[in-house]
Structure formats: C-alpha cells, structure tokens
C-alpha cells in the first residue's frame, strides 16, 4: 500500500490543501492528513476543531485519514507507516524551504517527499489570508473546500 502523510497546521484547511489531497490520491492508496500541534504557534481554531472539520470534509472517502501529532513529522510518518510525505508548493520560496526539509527527511528517515505545485488559480490562497479575512468579518467561503463551514 502506498501511503503518504500530508502534514500542516491547516488553520484553516483551504481549497489549496484540498486540491493537494485530491491530486495525491491519484497516485497514493491512502493519504493521512497530519495536523501538527505546535504550542508556540497561536492558532485560530483549536486542534480538535480542525480535525473535526477535515474529517467531515472527507467522511465519504475511506482513503483519507486525519490525525493530530506533536512530534517530528518524520516520526509521525513512521508511526503511520507512510513511505511518502506530500507537500504543496505555491512559490519559489516554498520550493526552496521544502527542498531542504525533504533532503533532511530523506537522510534521517529514508522518507521521500513529493512536491505538488499548486494549481495557478490557487496560488494566492493561504490559511494566513483566510484568517486575516475572518478577523475582519469577511466571507471566506470562496477559499474553502465546498461544504466546509467555519463557525
């Protein structure tokens, strides 16, 4: 079985994230969405809420699992018996950062990272932008996967 983890904070999960998962499922048997817990990072939504929102989104697809973790990503990948890490790339800066991390993960754990370039129409969408819009009371529906609601 080809299993990948898709790690991130997902605060919140956007249509860009959704696109990465759907595209990864075209060549993976299973994708585990790993919500990293970082006590030093202030989040808009509690971890449990993010897990719940993403689980609801993929409730009809048994190939997608959702779990939170508070360890190194490579340790989470090992715990989930994943052979791959999937990451989305929006910019050159993202690529340079992810390339370095992918190299370290390969050297430390033998885990390959698959970089998926964002679809052009989604490159400007980020969780940071969505949180800023929420802060000012704006409707963020166009930036969320269909059916996802933010309370």
UniProtKB/Swiss-Prot annotation:
Biological process (GO), any one: coenzyme A biosynthetic process
Cellular component annotations (GO), alphabetically ordered: cytoplasm
Functional pathway: Cofactor biosynthesis; coenzyme A biosynthesis; CoA from (R)-pantothenate: step 4/5
Known EC number: 2.7.7.3
Organism ancestry: Bacteria, Pseudomonadati, Bacteroidota, Bacteroidia, Bacteroidales
Reactions performed catalytically: (R)-4'-phosphopantetheine + ATP + H(+) = 3'-dephospho-CoA + diphosphate
Residues of the signal peptide: none
UniProt keyword annotation of Nucleotidyltransferase present: yes
Protein's organism: Phocaeicola vulgatus (strain ATCC 8482 / DSM 1447 / JCM 5826 / CCUG 4940 / NBRC 14291 / NCTC 11154) (Bacteroides vulgatus)
Pfam families, sorted: CTP_transf_like
Protein name as it appears in the record: Phosphopantetheine adenylyltransferase
Tree of life domain: Bacteria
Record site feature (Transition state stabilizer), residues: 17
PANTHER family: PHOSPHOPANTETHEINE ADENYLYLTRANSFERASE (PTHR21342:SF1)
Positions that bind ATP: 9-10, 17, 88-90, 98, 122-128
Entry keyword Cytoplasm: yes
Record: residues binding substrate: 9, 41, 73, 87
Cofactor: Mg(2+)
Known partners and oligomeric status: Homohexamer.
């Amino acid at each position: 079985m080809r299993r990948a983890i898709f790690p991130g904070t997902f605060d919140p999960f956007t249509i860009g994230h959704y696109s990465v998962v759907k595209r990864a499922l075209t060549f993976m048997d299973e994708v585990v969405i790993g919500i990293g817990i970082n006590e030093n990072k202030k989040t808009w939504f509690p971890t449990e809420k993010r897990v719940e929102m993403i689980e609801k989104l993929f409730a009809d697809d048994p190939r997608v699992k959702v779990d939170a973790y508070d360890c190194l990503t490579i340790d989470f990948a090992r715990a989930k018996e994943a052979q791959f890490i999937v990451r989305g790339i929006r910019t050159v800066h993202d690529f340079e950062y992810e390339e370095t991390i992918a190299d370290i993960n390969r050297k430390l754990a033998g885990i390959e990272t698959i970089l998926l370039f964002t679809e052009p129409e989604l490159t400007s969408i980020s969780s940071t932008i969505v949180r800023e819009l929420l802060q000012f009371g704006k409707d963020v529906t166009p930036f969320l996967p269909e059916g996802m609601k933010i309370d």
